[in-house]
Amino acid sequence: LSNETPAEKKALKTLKLGKTYSLVGEPENYILLDYIRYSTDGINYAKPLHHMALFNRLLKERYEGKLYLKYEFDVDALPEVCNLLAEDTNTISVTVNGETVERNGSSPLEKALWKYDVASKLKVGRNEIVILINYFQSETVYYALFGENVTETLKNCLAYDTDIEACALKGSFGVYGDFAKGKEENIVIGENFRIGKQKQTITRLIEEGYPFFSGDITLKQTVIVEDTN
């Protein structure tokens, strides 16, 4: 064993980072469209409903037939890249601001999501996407939901013939809205989301353009080090 006294370790110094970061590149962003105005004739539309609330209404009414699903959103600045990501729920057609768009493969995020290039169809202001579907459910679905003496096994194996889903837009844009602090720490509540130009400097990621972001994003900042010892 050595009798040498171990060298005293120097206390580590804390390097404080600033609050503002610069955005590197143009990461593809997302906005979720989960409220729907629906119509059975393509002319008269109901007030906006959350997609799950609409689904429950249709199940209770046992509706069957063509169904127009209108997703509305606002655009402050037109993005160069914008794709609609939507599931095939017995889809007949998809229009953006009255113009038909065609499928352009599936999303790398999830193969069940079809991709539609909609950038050239957007306009500044209120935009609308209308997805026309053939809505129906089999009697097996209604029996499992509302029948008597239904086993848990049948309920657990239930598969709907037609779903009512939210859709999303993915592209080179920022997403902005009205934000407020939630009841718990680090919880933020947002509403009235809209598409705008991506900010180049960011202090708070969620409130400054990325409330729905999923994926990798690179931020940078300059740090001044006065003492390197």
Task: Outline where the language-model segments fall.
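Aromatic-lined ligand-binding clefts that engage carbohydrates, nucleic acids, or primary amines
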Residues: 73-98, 129, 223-225, 229
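Short beta-strands within extracellular/lumenal beta-sheet-rich domains
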Residues: 61-75, 112-116, 213-227
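Generic beta-strand/beta-sheet core signal
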Residues: 85-87, 97, 104, 132-134, ...
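An acidic-aromatic loop/edge-strand motif
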Residues: 1-63, 122-222
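Solvent-exposed beta-strand/loop surfaces of large extracellular or lumenal domains
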Residues: 89, 94-116
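Extracellular structured ligand-interaction cores
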Residues: 68-70, 81, 89-91, 113, ...
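A glycine-anchored, Pro-Gly-centered beta-turn/N-cap motif
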Residues: 80, 118, 123-125
